[in-house]
Amino acid sequence: MEYVYVTKENIEKEHICCAISNNSDVQVRSKKDWLSCRFEEGLVFIKSSVRGKCFIEYIPAKNAWIPIIGDTYMYIDCLWVAGSLKGHGFSSELLNMCIEDSKRKGMDGICILSSKKKMPYLADPKFLTYKGFRVSDEASNGIQLWYLSFNDFDLPKFKSCAKDCHIEESGFVLYYTSQCPFNAKYVPIIENLSKEMNIEFKAIHLDTKEKAQNAPTPITTYALFYNGEYVTNDVMNEKKFLKLVEKLK
């Protein structure tokens, strides 16, 4: 498999895997704008040359848009290989590229979000275990910080603000970033739907690194709360949201 490094110089002509439409699409534009500002902070985006979801995105943890402590670690934003491309070792190849790059840059290890059981948009814990990762911290909502250490130094951990996953607000409250392109499409859909149905809903866009690093949740790409309690990180479309509303009544 051949791989392509997406950079500030070629991002306008390269697709970004999870959103493959043209540059005028709101999801593509949102993600590309976000990426373009992250490259100077050390973000690396590597994708396969085939058209589809097969890529890894990582950044030094000190610049990651989540509330973690671990400045000498590299944080993996996303490692995604679509089902149609599984079974060929692409996940391992992409992970190894991240490991070797992190070592060259003097990092003490790499880390990524996962959970005891597979959750939407999080790394597969079985794959991480197979690759030698271990859990260094866990929040009250079950989201875990997994790490692979190159040296025996301090392990990465969640900031205290992200551990309890509780907020003092009623109704639905969504924290999200532009790291996930789907948010540019689906957050407005849920906002409009909630308004039409008189559902209490508030969306909080974490539009700076500082806001994301001090969020009340270990996952910031998409974290939905209801009456103060964490509910899900699964990106809601109209059907999913209505089903969730009915369930929580």
Model-identified regions with their sequence ranges:
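Conserved catalytic-core motifs of GNAT/GCN5-like acyltransferases
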Residues: 113, 129-146, 231
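C-terminal "cap" of GNAT-fold acetyltransferases
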Residues: 140-164
